[in-house]
Each structure stands twice: as C-alpha cells, then as structure tokens.
C-alpha cells in the first residue's frame, strides 16, 4: 500500500538514518515538478548536497528523450553501468528516474534485476504521475510514497477569476428563461472563455518550463530538454482540465440539488 504523506521527507530521512530506508522508492503525485522537488529534497539529505546545489558525482538521472518521450533501453543500461561502479565519494549512490512511466518494456525489463538486487548502498527513486502505466513488476518491487501537494494553478488568481466567470456562464446556460431571451451572448462568452483558458494554460506552462529548466540538476541534451518541456506542458494542461472537470461536476451537482428543493 502507498504511504500517504503530505511531506514524506522527514519520515524517509529518519528511515535512512536508522538504516531501514527501502532501496527502491516510487514517488507518486499529480504534478511531476512537485514530485521531483520532494524526491530531490530527500536526495540532498542522503548525499549531503547543499540546498542551493543540484549536482553530485554519485547522483544519476534517467529521463525520457526524443519526440516520442521514451526512456530507452540503451540509456537504461548506461545507468545500470554507473550504479554498478564504486561510489565516487565513498557513500551512497542514488538514481532518479524521471517520468518512470515512460520506460519502454525493454528498458523496464533490463532494469528489473538492478531494482531487485541493487548494488550496495544504492537507492533508486522512480518518479511518476501515472503509476499504472508502469509494469506491475516494477511497481511491486518499490515502496510507494503518495505525495500530496496543492497544484500551482490553484494559487493563480487569474485562474480563480476565470473559474468564477465560467461558473456564472454555466448558471446562465441552465437558466432557461434567460436563455430564451438571449441565445447569442452565451455563444460569444464561450469564445472569450476559451481564449482566456488557453492564455492561462500557455502562460502557466511557460512559467513552469522556465522554472524547471532553471533548477535542473544537470545539463540535458536537446532531445531530453524537448521531451521534458513537452511533458511539463502536457502536465499543466491536464491539471487545468482536471480542475475544470471537477468544477463543472460541482456546479451540476449544486444545480440538481437546487431543483430538488
């Protein structure tokens, strides 16, 4: 069963200090940047990396790359080779596998033995927002840590204002008498809402990309960078659409209750 923790780092740090930290952790969350930040916080503690730094000779990253945004078996084998070498600093080694759900079946199978029997003092942190897109054999060999976190979009004032306008628009559509008098205005309002939504998503995605790329713990090649940006933009869009779906559902439920009373 996944651990359900709003901030797991203190608990996991204590497990590491006690020598009981599981060698394979699967970090689950709704937003990859948030998952990565919390996994990196634990990584810094284990490897003794200062807060303002992200690099360490015993820290290795594996990311999707290319237009297909996949983790290839070739890159996976390179990581396995690094983990099987002696520690550069004489301590622990950590592998961060970003968007682990993007591992191709061949890559996941190649990594399975390392996950089952990792080299001594080696930890593997798999990060994902889509755990059920991973091979069950990979998931079952990890301690799952479910992370809670408020999406950045919920802090966006422009988005909150948009939701208020959207709610008013929906209520207007549900008002049959008002709709009989004016069927044109709601159509034009829909165009405005759509344009506003696309603008907010684009701006939030741009900000998230800039922030993540600025904080990257390593220099990426162009294929990895393109894959990362694509993943961030898809994640931001999915987050907004998820909230929009929830808002629409809550309005419909509220309206049905009002009809019953």
Where is each model-derived feature located?
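Short loop/turn elements that form and flank the Walker-type P-loop nucleotide-binding site
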Residues: 20-21, 55-57, 88-91, 118-121
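Flexible beta-alpha connector loops of hexameric P-loop NTPases
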Residues: 67-73
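Structural motif
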Residues: 94-96, 125
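Conserved alpha-helical scaffold flanking the Walker A/P-loop in AAA+ ATPase domains
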Residues: 10-16, 73-94, 102, 106-113
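Charged, glycine-rich active-site and insertion segments that engage polyanionic ligands
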Residues: 1-33, 37-52, 120-123, 128-261
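Residues immediately C-terminal
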Residues: 102-103, 117, 133
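Conserved catalytic segments around the Walker B and adjacent sensor/switch elements
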Residues: 50-64
């Amino acid at each position: 069963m996944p651990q359900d923790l709003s901030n797991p780092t203190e608990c996991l740090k204590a497990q590491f200090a006690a020598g009981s930290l599981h060698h394979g952790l699967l970090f689950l969350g709704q937003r990859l940047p948030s998952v990565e930040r919390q996994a990196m916080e634990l990584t810094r503690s284990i490897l003794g990396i200062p807060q303002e730094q992200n690099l360490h000779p015993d820290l290795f990253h594996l990311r999707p790359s290319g237009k297909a945004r996949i983790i290839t078996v070739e890159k996976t084998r390179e990581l396995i080779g690094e983990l099987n070498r002696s520690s550069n600093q004489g301590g622990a080694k950590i592998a961060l596998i970003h968007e682990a759900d993007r591992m191709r079946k061949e890559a996941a199978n190649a990594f399975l033995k390392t996950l089952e029997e990792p080299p001594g003092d080696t930890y593997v942190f798999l990060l994902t927002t889509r755990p059920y897109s991973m091979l069950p054999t990979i998931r079952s060999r990890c301690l799952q840590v479910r992370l809670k976190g408020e999406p950045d979009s919920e802090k966006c004032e422009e988005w909150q204002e948009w939701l208020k306008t959207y709610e008013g628009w929906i209520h207007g559509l549900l008002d049959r008498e008002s709709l009989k008098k004016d069927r044109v205005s709601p159509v034009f309002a829909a165009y405005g809402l759509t344009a506003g939504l696309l603008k907010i998503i684009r701006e939030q995605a741009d900000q998230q990309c800039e922030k993540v790329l600025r904080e990257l713990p390593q220099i990426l090649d162009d294929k990895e960078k393109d894959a990362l940006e694509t993943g961030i933009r898809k994640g931001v869009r999915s987050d907004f659409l998820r909230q929009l779906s929830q808002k629409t559902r809550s309005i419909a439920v509220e309206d049905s209750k009002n009809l019953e009373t």
